[in-house]
């Protein structure tokens, strides 16, 4: 578990704007796991919360604009952070996600 925590790269800190969609502000630190590959070829995405280094859940996402699906790992997220992440992935008609708790 500690290995996963050490491999996190947070490239979009909480409170920063998305590079392509400046109206979107990240509610929780967001990044990826170094030395991994997801379906889009980039590193596996992570939401890194404020409550430690335990994996809480995963979000399975379908993005109709990008025409892909992804899995995002939630690490150390509080209930409030999990709720904000869930809402983020379900607030538009173009992206939907399901939360799978550990």
Regions found by a protein language model. Name each.
Residues 1:
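Catalytic phosphate/metal-binding cores of nucleic-acid and nucleotide-processing enzymes, i.e., regions
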Residues 4-5:
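Short, small-residue-biased leader/transition segments that mark boundaries at the very start
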Residues 8-33:
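N-terminal first-folded block
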Residues 9-11, 31-33, 47-49, 60-62, ...:
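Residues in well-ordered beta-strands of folded domains
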Residues 17, 39-40, 68, 82:
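A broad, structure-centric signal for solvent-exposed, well-ordered loop/edge residues
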Residues 25-48:
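Compact, glycine-rich, soluble single-domain proteins
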Residues 53:
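Catalytic, metal-anchored helix/loop core of enzyme active sites in primary metabolism
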Residues 57-102:
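Helix-rich interaction surfaces within compact, conserved domain-sized segments
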């Amino acid at each position: 578990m500690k290995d996963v925590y050490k491999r996190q790269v947070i490239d979009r800190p909480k409170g920063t704007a998305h590079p392509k969609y400046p109206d979107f502000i990240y509610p929780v630190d967001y990044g990826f796991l170094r030395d991994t590959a997801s379906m889009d070829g980039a590193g596996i995405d992570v939401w890194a919360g404020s409550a430690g280094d335990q994996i809480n859940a995963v979000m399975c996402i379908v993005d109709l604009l990008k025409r892909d699906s992804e899995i995002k790992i939630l690490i150390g997220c509080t209930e409030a952070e999990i709720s904000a992440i869930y809402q983020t992935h379900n607030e538009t008609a173009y992206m939907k996600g399901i939360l799978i708790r550990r």
